[in-house]
Amino acid sequence: MTVLKMTDLDLQGKRVLIREDLNVPVKDGVVASDARILAALPTIKLALEKGAAVMVCSHLGRPTEGEFSAENSLKPVADYLSKALGRDVPLVADYLDGVAVQAGELVLFENVRFNKGEKKNADELAQKYAALCDVFVMDAFGTAHRAEGSTHGVAKFAKVAAAGPLLAAELDALGKALKAPAKPMAAIVAGSKVSTKLDVLNSLSSVCDQLIVGGGIANTFLAAAGHPVGKSLYEPDLVDTAKAIAAKVSVPLPVDVVVAKEFAETAEATVKAIADVAADDMILDIGPQTAANFAELLKSSKTILWNGPVGVFEFDQFGNGTKVLAKAIADSAAFSIAGGGDTLAAIDKYGVSKEISYISTGGGAFLEFVEGKVLPAVAILEERAKA
């Protein structure tokens, strides 16, 4: 995957527009989770160190396009950046017709979704973005699967279009895990439904050696193998699909599970052998023997891709399976990559973020890359690099 990289460019005195993913949760006018801002900071600092006049843009939330809304304003992000960088970071609302920024200065543009034509990727808007800068830097992997004005359109028209360090690192890590993985490779794919992860499961079945499934997805595979799943969440109409996937790749199934009679924080957890699951049982986690078996598989893997907790880890009594696998990945010498919202929450809960080789910041984009889909914002950078 050949793209121009910001790190290779001379930015001295250049006007640089950086598209970041600063779509963070905001509560009472204050940033509630700063993970995405922290991920973007090194890119912003590097552009400033290289002597650029730096303009940063992002979306936040889902405002009605073309209309300002205070709740979707990036003001809390500008305030956060000012504190984090120890300098004033002005929030600029009217920037489409030009903005004065000097070398070494930094401004944050107001929410790009307040601009008409952003989501439709209108050429007229994209050309206005492009006219603001000498160099456009796409650094928002989390929105790379969307062809929008500030992610794709601007890269068509900017004098120079490059990948930022964060985007480049994502592409390198995903390429390492999927294009030429060190073998054996294990993938953990968990979630409530096979239907939502079908493309991911199919794509990984042709590249990995062990496909570990969890959550409602595992229940469908268990049912496909003729095991009882009680009143657990599963998809009867996808049993044949599960069988077809299991015929292509090794899908180790749980030998024991943690069940309850209800889905609740106060539900009583009981460990049962898979054959003993009763008609009124709900499977809410893998059992301790299964967790140990899966951890052993991970120990011998050279590449591990993790997407989704294997149980209802938000309730502690159903969190052991995810905890054991998280620790196994952390202790492994394998190249490990993890992504997807719930996966990140599990990584935080069990404190293993420093031991995982790469944690992807993109939820939907991560999944689409794993599915083998083309990410429009990356494809345009590749096109521009060829030209």
Swiss-Prot record:
The keyword Nucleotide-binding applies. GO terms for cellular component: cytosol. GO terms for biological process: gluconeogenesis; glycolytic process. It is an enzyme of class 2 (transferase). Its EC number is 2.7.2.3. Disulfide bonds: none annotated. Substrate binds at D21, L22, N23, R36, H59, L60, G61, R62, R113, R146. GO terms for molecular function: ADP binding; ATP binding; phosphoglycerate kinase activity. It catalyses: (2R)-3-phosphoglycerate + ATP = (2R)-3-phospho-glyceroyl phosphate + ADP. PANTHER family: PHOSPHOGLYCERATE KINASE (PTHR11406), PHOSPHOGLYCERATE KINASE 1, CHLOROPLASTIC-RELATED (PTHR11406:SF23). Belongs to the phosphoglycerate kinase family. This is Phosphoglycerate kinase.
